[in-house]
């Protein structure tokens, strides 16, 4: 794998990164198994991977929004503009246009955000 990046500083001084990765194998027609090697929409097992669990809980959970928080900034016309919560998905799939729908198993794992238990349906890949 090869990577190239640039970091810009926005008007308020916050960094903004642009990243590009070149993978050494042919990725022109990705398969679900290839996608699963690099992208995950699952909460890690807190006993097997406590650091991964903590990082996903802190940085990769959307919301809550929808009926759990109708005043969330992402809400437009009573629905989440980002499509959360996403439906559970047993396997990663790719539609005819090449759009991937990521695996989101209903495995009982959750992240507690205030009074809400957020499952894999709320993970931002």
Map each language-model feature to its residues.
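Extended, structured polyanion-binding interfaces
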Residues: 1-125
């Amino acid at each position: 794998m090869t990577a190239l990046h640039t970091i810009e500083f926005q008007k308020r001084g916050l960094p903004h990164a642009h990243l590009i990765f070149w993978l050494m194998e042919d990725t022109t027609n990705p398969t679900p198994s290839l996608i699963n090697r690099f992208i995950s929409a699952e909460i890690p097992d807190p006993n097997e991977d406590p650091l991964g669990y903590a990082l996903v809980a802190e940085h990769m959970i959307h919301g809550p929004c929808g009926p759990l928080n109708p005043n969330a900034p992402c809400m437009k016309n009573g629905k989440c503009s980002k499509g959360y919560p996403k439906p559970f998905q047993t396997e990663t799939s790719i539609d005819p246009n090449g759009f991937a729908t990521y695996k989101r198993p209903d495995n009982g794992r959750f992240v507690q955000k205030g009074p809400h238990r957020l499952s894999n349906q709320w993970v931002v890949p």
